[in-house]
């Protein structure tokens, strides 16, 4: 479809024509196609709307069905229940109507060995020894300095002051991470 500008609207320069062929193979325009051509030719592009192709004939879709079935062969669905067989309940066989089901007086008893807990405990132990943890020398040295500060404070103070001052110093050391 080609368009050419017109003041105020766009008009269709050429529209798609639907041709059919007779038995000899000569092409001719059908009446509906010819009417649609004149109808569409008189409308502006805005009145036509978002159509990009000409109108479909009513029975043209039926003519496409054989070709579509050739390109997409019919195959059964993959999630089909047609192949599964469900056992349906059957009526009882004659002669068994008055019989009672067999009842077991004694329950089935099976001796089950208790699990060996030693083997389970051994299996839960790691095969390798636990990793060794090392402490930084600076941290150990700082702890010794803190203990030395507290001991000096305890030596210099007397009586109740010793306990109160030691508590204050240890609290400040713990709170400040010193």
From Swiss-Prot:
This is Uncharacterized protein YGL235W.
